[in-house]
Amino acid sequence: MSERKYFGTDGIRGKVGDSPITPDFVLKLGWAAGKVLARHGSRKIIIGKDTRISGYMLESALEAGLAAAGLSASFTGPMPTPAVAYLTRTFRAEAGIVISASHNPYYDNGIKFFSIDGTKLPDEVEEAIEAEMEKPITCVESAELGRANRIVDAAGRYIEFCKGTFPNENNLNGLKVVVDCAHGATYHIAPNVFRELGAEVITIGCEPTGININDECGATDVRMLQKRVLEEGADVGLAFDGDGDRIIMVDHKGLKVDGDQILYIIAREALRQGQLRGGAVGTLMSNMGLEIALKQLGIPFVRAKVGDRYVLEKLQEKGWRLGAENSGHIILLDKTTTGDGIVAGLQVLSAMVRNHMSLHDLCSGMKLLPQILVNVRFTGNHDPLQSTEVQQVAKEVEAELGGKGRVLLRKSGTEPLIRVMVEGENEEQVTAMANRIADAVKHVG
């Protein structure tokens, strides 16, 4: 695979107004993608976005570029990323494009693509798009220019799809649910899904202004959700990120339930129902407690590199159906083609209803080991992870853990960050260890 100039682990992302997230770049990206995708026959593209104010500008730029290449665009308006993947499949479009920076602040944005089957674009297609970017824009003949239209019932279609993943014989009657949509793309979808299935729904983070997405709310900050669940005496809280492909939950005691615990609940329920195919895929960041708990159930577990696309690749390689990141990307291949927060949440609620158990009790079979993550920002083009000083400190910490924990250092695929993770039996000890390594990274970074 050749070195990428623009595409990262999750499409193209950056600060709006800085290269590459500028109107002229995105217009050219639309044209280059159009040229590559037009070779495959279909000339229809689905375009969705989250609630960032910059989405309008970037949507227009993409449309212009695609039209110049002869491709037509169908707009969904604000729509979760997994909804765009679903609509791309059902409309038999050549590709889907999502304008979103997921869990990042409003001033960032990004572009990611889905192929005709609702999965991320293969590497070779992304590389072909990058190659086209180096060429000057040429416009097709006027009669061949692309058109644009809106999919008026996009939200309703996706709501029905989500509800269809919940068992017909069950409902959410009598369940009090707090839903935090991060002022993002699920704001007009998630509350309706849970309400229509019978739950009493209390909403927070459902008033997008274009600049409040992910602002002290949603899957990356559940403090407000925890507070509200306790205040309302709710049975459960569900928090989505800005584009709806992640979920973090909160139990009735106000305790956070992360992606590892959600994967455990769904895998155990699939085993109980005789529907588990193979095992489960986590990542290098998955808690050792998940691995131990699944092993006790006899469920095979393997780790992929961090990033939902790598979880998906590992699932396809193994022929398995369940995978997750602890950050809340849950992939259920018997129901969806990508991480889907709403669908994952429904499977957990289904397990609660079916077993007459609280979320707290469903988690009780798994004990999370203390895991400390420290993000260290770095500048320049050098890689702090190549530093002998950093490597030496990491080696010392690993020796001190003595096989009863893990050290993981990695570069973020979307931001100039080094992520330092230390896991072990004693929280105080692993916190000190993580800070020790982080200090070494800061020193060289």
Curated annotation (Swiss-Prot):
Q: How is the cofactor bound?
A: Binds 1 Mg(2+) ion per subunit.
**Modifications made to the protein after synthesis:** Activated by phosphorylation.
Q: What's one GO MF term for it?
A: phosphomannomutase activity
What is one Pfam family matched by this protein? Answer: PGM_PMM_I
* CDD domains referenced in this protein's UniProt entry, alphabetically: GlmM
Q: What is its EC number?
A: 5.4.2.10
A single Gene Ontology CC term: cytosol
Coiled-coil regions listed = none
Which positions are catalytic residues? Answer: S102
Swiss-Prot/TrEMBL cofactor(s): Mg(2+)
InterPro entries attached to this UniProt entry? A-D-PHexomutase_a/b/a-I, A-D-PHexomutase_a/b/a-I/II/III, A-D-PHexomutase_a/b/a-II, A-D-PHexomutase_a/b/a-III, A-D-PHexomutase_C, A-D-PHexomutase_C_sf, A-D-PHexomutase_CS, Alpha-D-phosphohexomutase_SF
Keywords of this entry: Isomerase, Magnesium, Metal-binding, Phosphoprotein
Give the reactions, separated by semicolons, that this protein catalyses. alpha-D-glucosamine 1-phosphate = D-glucosamine 6-phosphate
The cross-references to NCBIfam families, in alphabetical order and at most eight, read: glmM (TIGR01455), PRK10887.1 (NF008139)
Hey, which family's this protein in?
Answer: Belongs to the phosphohexose mutase family.
**Its biological function?**
Catalyzes the conversion of glucosamine-6-phosphate to glucosamine-1-phosphate.
HAMAP family attached to this UniProt entry: GlmM_B
The protein in question is named: Phosphoglucosamine mutase
Q: What is the source species?
A: Proteus mirabilis (strain HI4320)
The beginning of the lineage is: Bacteria, Pseudomonadati, Pseudomonadota, Gammaproteobacteria, Enterobacterales
This protein's encoding gene: glmM
